[in-house]
Curated annotation (Swiss-Prot):
Protein's name according to its UniProt entry: Anaerobic nitric oxide reductase transcription regulator NorR
Binding site for ATP: 215-222, 278-287
Keyword Transport listed: no
Function: Required for the expression of anaerobic nitric oxide (NO) reductase, acts as a transcriptional activator for at least the norVW operon. Activation also requires sigma-54. Not required for induction of the aerobic NO-detoxifying enzyme NO dioxygenase. Binds to the promoter region of norVW, to a consensus target sequence, GT-(N7)-AC, which is highly conserved among proteobacteria.
Taxonomic superkingdom: Bacteria
Domain Sigma-54 factor interaction per the UniProt entry, residue ranges: 187-416
GO molecular function annotation: ATP binding; ATP hydrolysis activity; cis-regulatory region sequence-specific DNA binding; DNA-binding transcription activator activity; DNA-binding transcription factor activity; ferrous iron binding; identical protein binding; nitric oxide binding
Induction: By anaerobic conditions, however not induced by NO alone.
Amino acid sequence: MSFSVDVLANIAIELQRGIGHQDRFQRLITTLRQVLECDASALLRYDSRQFIPLAIDGLAKDVLGRRFALEGHPRLEAIARAGDVVRFPADSELPDPYDGLIPGQESLKVHACVGLPLFAGQNLIGALTLDGMQPDQFDVFSDEELRLIAALAAGALSNALLIEQLESQNMLPGDATPFEAVKQTQMIGLSPGMTQLKKEIEIVAASDLNVLISGETGTGKELVAKAIHEASPRAVNPLVYLNCAALPESVAESELFGHVKGAFTGAISNRSGKFEMADNGTLFLDEIGELSLALQAKLLRVLQYGDIQRVGDDRCLRVDVRVLAATNRDLREEVLAGRFRADLFHRLSVFPLSVPPLRERGDDVILLAGYFCEQCRLRQGLSRVVLSAGARNLLQHYSFPGNVRELEHAIHRAVVLARATRSGDEVILEAQHFAFPEVTLPTPEVAAVPVVKQNLREATEAFQRETIRQALAQNHHNWAACARMLETDVANLHRLAKRLGLKD
């Protein structure tokens, strides 16, 4: 088999049809999977010796949340080191990173694997991976044909990365190349709430405004603060952290503003406070709502005039500090109750950000679960950690009052429990490994029997059409996987789909 001009043109067209980068990447992966008839495909971005999935097809959804460190994935390391197409033999001793992550094939090992490194000039920027369940699945495609595919994908990814850098309005170091940007915090999530939050972070990071980050406990407010700092012009200077809830009243002023020798009993030397440490950088005040009214007044002065006074010192020191504050309280209610100063609230909340709770983030819970599974795999030296269908269903229907922090602890605990019930270095997390309070899973509703308005043939075709649509959706539009699920020959399925108007 060889690629026709029409096939390559179709791939190029799909790369232009998407509205955003994510849509274009997904179209590319879906089209490649159809053209190459593979069971799974993925587009990965290379960053700091790890591959980050950008788009997948035929793989479990939690793959999008995983971060594949080269040290833990020898096949991906081989792809990163190669300058050309990499074909792994079916009997390769190198474990495949997607073993157990192809829906419906969890118990089988991937047999055919091709890796295409993607370059912008001499810089590795990503990779395309193609996987199949048959050993000789990709033998019909020449290296030259696969290089054409890699060139198209590399061009799309290179343009996307360049546009991303321009849109971020961040200046690179003077000697940096376009693909050597300062590493920034990765915030995992594709839900509308997280997409909006990422846009707002990008907007406010380029400014010097104070930011008030609100959200429930465990939602990741500190991660938001870190992302703002790392995407700001202050990124080369320190981000200093202070938990106001853990600050004893007796030393709170000293912690914030510092003290001079002899200022109080135990002050045996001069000491800089958090504001001095954060000069020209960023100060993150976590749980700002826990500060006393007296300290709030002193903090307000710093925000107004930009100077601090060490405890026991009459002199004022000028500081240039951006303040990011976080709280799990409703500070408006605290102001009305007289527990928080209104003037300080308005100074801090120049640009308010709200971090959505995990229960409102939809499928993000699965992406995050994949991220934590990969972390556990690396830390505990396991060959793979995967979620069963039952575990995924449970995670999607639990409310997570402790949010992302609770999910992280639940995954780590489940891995420990799962390891105790089976030998070997492969772990499959089942629903029973999660010690959640009772979760009511939805039961399929029995549809009312419709009034017959079709003849038998029309009703049969309508049933076949809907069954095929559902099977395609469950298998990410992979016709081969769909045929296996429906227990029919793939060629017969294609013919039936054409007759039913599901294919051109």
